[in-house]
Amino acid sequence: MLGNCIENVRKNVPLVHNITNYVTVNDVANILLACGGSPIMSAEPEDVEDITSICGGLNINIGTLTKSSIEGMFRAGRKANELNHPILLDPVGAGASALRTNTAVQLMEQLKLTVIRGNISEIKTLALGSGTTKGVDADVADAVTEETLDQAVQFVRQFAAKSGSIVAITGAIDLVSDGEKCYVIRNGRPEMGKITGTGCQLSGMMTAFLVANPDNHLEAAAAAVCTMGLAGEIGWGRRQEGDGNSTYRNRIIDAVYNMDASTLDKGAKYEVR
């Protein structure tokens, strides 16, 4: 059951190296603490190899790239591969600019990535060289819906097999595949889109799940997606008059903090294809 995955995070307290963006860095740190992990942030090229060496996994997020941070990503990634640590790539805004797209593609080509997690437009850009990324958000034209679900499942399965990485596409319907099995997940609330950084938070948390569950990375990735979506549902259910997106953000983090195996197993909404 997926609940075992979050219990393993709480037992092992995995230290995660995050090279993430400055928009959401604090929220990424807090959700890692909430799920039972431990965060450390560093993008400086002269620092990252030492930091990666003391951690269990690496979360690479390209949301606010600089020449220095790009160098740091490759240095940290090579060190993580050397140590056989899981690496997650979050290709934020791939398709929105040449720099983002090229950086994400080069990271895919030069590093062994455990998971690639993004919205459908970002993933389509990496897989097909096309996609209609709207800033850092997925375009509605790319959305995974009940009508397009079978096609989307086939797409994510094929890209996972081709890339050699688990691929997680998050949106109204989430898909997580290793090239063979595909989890179709229906947790979450549309209001989560009114909070910046829920995807970045998920990437950080998912990396902790990967570290703590080394024998089943696919299930760990799916469990992280269900945890985040279920936290969104729980947080929304606790809203009060006058609450806005800032309060909702905190309620999501609180819901992750209080999540246990039983709550996750009862609330996770998924099927495996």
Please provide the spans of the model-predicted regions.
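Glycine/small-residue-rich loop that forms an oxyanion/phosphate-binding "nest" at active or ligand-binding sites
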Residues: 69-118
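Conserved phosphate/ATP/ADP-binding segment of small-molecule kinases
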Residues: 100-182
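Short, small-residue alpha-helix embedded
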Residues: 194-226
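Conserved N-terminal subdomain of the carbohydrate kinase-like
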Residues: 2-89
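Short, well-structured alpha-helical segments that form the helix of a local strand-helix-strand
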Residues: 155-160, 217-232, 252-253
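Charged C-terminal helix
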Residues: 230-273
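Short pre-catalytic strand/loop immediately N-terminal to key active-site residues, enriched for Gly-Thr
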Residues: 185-196
